[in-house]
Amino acid sequence: MNSSSKELYFRMLRIRMVEEKIAELYSEQEMRCPVHLSIGQEAVAVGVCEHLDQKDIIMSAHRAHAHYLAKGGNLKSMLAELYGKATGCAMGKGGSMHLVDLNSGFFA
């Protein structure tokens, strides 16, 4: 819990910007899964994850993007997952609702 308010704000802003971009790109109908955005829930995810250690494991529900990113999940892997690519965090099989990052200790 060493982050400044400014750092926490920028983490929340990053998540919001990612979510807004996903919402924009989803209309192109190239993403292979329904998406469940976390817009409006960024502060909860960032606040909780601020108090966790790298070794802590968390699970989230179907609106997992914010928690995944706040816990340190890889953005490129998450986006690849939404597009159903084998390079996705669940090898393109989990979609938006089933994100996984073992290195970050995250499951949804």
Region locations from a protein language model:
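A broad, low-specificity signal for short, low-complexity segments enriched in glycine/proline
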Residues: K6, E19-E20
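Charged, compositionally biased N-terminal leader segments and the immediate start
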Residues: M1-L8
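Short hydrophobic/aromatic segments of transmembrane alpha-helices and their interfaces
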Residues: S3, Y26-S27
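Cofactor-binding active-site loop characterized by glycine-rich and histidine/acidic residues
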Residues: E20-E24, E30-A108
